[in-house]
Amino acid sequence: MKLRLLLLIPLALASVVPFALATVNDALSFAKEAAAPYAKQGYTIREDAWGGDLGVKDQQAVTAQLFKGNEYGFWLATDTRGAVITVHIYDSDGKLAETEFWQKGRFAGAKITPNKTGAYYAIVTVEKSPQERSNWALVYGYR
């Protein structure tokens, strides 16, 4: 009986793990969808992406090395219907550095044209959500 139970546990986990990962993948698909119109405007969308899950009012910092002279866009999405998310870009001194910000339901974005080359921080926040935790994904690009 114990052996049978031990064999069933990995099978049960194997069926749950892909489902859990699929939601982050859904958020990534939505983030790429948000970035698509900007690719038509000449942005090169990077393959780099970040994701995870956050509770309401929780934040996650994502670091990116940005270069003076380029214009960058960051696009954030969640797969949670009814969730409101935001992304804001800060410089290494902690000052808000974005030149544009938008938010529409499960999507958000920010643009920045850095004054200097260096580390910048995209702060992802779940402002509200019908769920305890919401999956999110962030992509970025430049032109």
Protein language model features and the residues they cover:
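Exposed aromatic-hydrophobic patches
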Residues: 62-63, 107-113
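Short, surface-exposed beta-strand/strand-loop-strand elements in extracellular ectodomains
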Residues: 81-96
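Bacterial N-terminal signal peptides
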Residues: 8-18
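Hydrophobic beta-strand segments within beta-rich accessory/binding domains
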Residues: 61-79, 121-124
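Extended, low-complexity, turn-rich repeat/linker tracts enriched in Gly/Pro/Ser/Thr and Asp/Glu
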Residues: 78-85, 129-131
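Positively charged n-region of N-terminal signal peptides that target proteins for export
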Residues: 1-5
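C-terminal edge strands of extracellular/lumenal beta-sandwich accessory domains
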Residues: 23-43, 120-143
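Extracellular beta-rich ligand/substrate-recognition surface
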Residues: 48-58, 103
